Each structure stands twice: as C-alpha cells, then as structure tokens.
Amino acid sequence: MATPSFGVRSTAGQVKDLLAPDAILVSVSKGIEKGTSLRMTQIIREVTEDKWPVVALSGPSHAEEVARQVPTAVVSACPDQTAAEVVQDLFINDHFRVYSSSDVIGVELGAALKNVMALCTGCCTGMGLGDNTKAMLMTRGLAETARLGTALGARKDTFAGLAGMGDLIVTCTSMNSRNYRAGILIGQGTPVQEAIRKIGAVVEGYYAVDSARELAAQVGVEMPITLAAYDVLYRDRDPREVLLSLMRREKRHEIEETWF
C-alpha cells in the first residue's frame, strides 16, 4: 500500500475482500493516524482483522532515485520474521538492497517523524541559518524520536539504522523531499497552508507532527522539537522565536538511557 497516511484506512478497507488467503501486505506509507495515534501497519491490521501479516518497507529511498536504479537500501520490518524475509527476497536486487527487521514499531516511527524534522531543517534553510543548526535539529530530533520509540517498545538501535538515521538524513537534506521544500518556504515567510499548496503534493510532516504530539502526551515522553514544530505549523508562531526558545531550554546531559 502506497497511499498518503490519511488514505491507508480507506484503502485497506477497499482491498481486504480481494486478498488471497496467503497474501502478505506491504506498507510503504509513512505517518501516524490523527485521533487514533496508530501506525500504518496497525491500521491495516485493524481493518483487515489481523488475518494477514503486514510488513513495513521503509528507509532512505526517494522514489525518483529508486526509479533510476540508484543504489538504495531499505528495511523490511514485521514481527513475523518469515513475512519480513519473504518481502526481503521479493524486492532485493542489484540496485535495491533490503534488510529484514522485527522492529516494526521503530521502523515506522522513524519513518513518520523524519518528516517532521525535515520541515524543521527546511525552515532553517529558508531562514538562512547554517549547517550547524540543521545538524543540531537532526541529531536532537533523532534523540526524541528514539525516546518516543523506546517508550512504545521499539529497539533503540533501530533509530541508528536505515529507517532512523538513514531516512532522516535523506529527508532533511534533499530537495527531493517535499517536507524539506515546504520547510524552506515556511522559513522564507510563506504562510503554512500556502507553502503546502505550493508543494502540490502531500506534506506528511504537517500531519505527523500533530499525531506525534498527541502520542507523546499519551505516554509521557518529552519531545521539544516536535512541539516547537507544532507551534510553527498550527499556532502560527515565528520560527525564529521558537528556535530561540529551544536554545534557552534548561541545560542537561546529552546521552540518555534511551539514546545509543
């Protein structure tokens, strides 16, 4: 299934009666559902009554480059390792390398939250800030993603892999990224909704930041960068003021128990 996150539920409902008994469902959608805080594979499993294994296929893989057969690596993740390895075998080839994982929670959270961080780094580019600021937001953004993930049962080392750090790097630095480009426009002063319209495609980070904020509140996890992004995107706060508030947070030790 390769739909925007808000279309996964309806799409799963449309196809569930067409599936063979031995089917394996593969989701390449990235996000967290608004209102339910469910990941994409959770939605599919719920709608299909958990009758089929659902695999998340994710990683640093801009479609434009995959189509050109640029060497790429991703992760096939499912608690059912047999299903993950079947998908691995189906997709792996000389230009598309696939690793398997049982940590679907970590893989899907990394996929969803990297879009939020890409909006942030794009905003920094739009404001004319340097590489230092973007590196700070990417690194600390990954830290809070790992913090949320481990609270929900993910393995912390997943966030150092392709679906975590890998996807974060490619999405936060490339003009192929819709979220990064939208962030640039916002940083240049374009109103949020106008920036999204100008991109002309779904900006998943806009939806993910609200869902991630709700999910973090549910499990009591601190996510300051995600909340800062929410303030800019939903409360029309000035990005420079929000960044300054992040810089003025209480000092702390860098390495956490949930970090690498």
Regions of interest found by a model, annotated:
Residues 1-71, 87:
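Rossmann-like NAD(P)(H) cofactor-binding subdomain of soluble oxidoreductases
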Residues 2-3, 31, 78, 173, ...:
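Conserved residues at beta->alpha junctions
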Residues 7, 18, 43-53, 71-158:
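Internal alpha-helical scaffold of NAD(P)-dependent oxidoreductase catalytic cores
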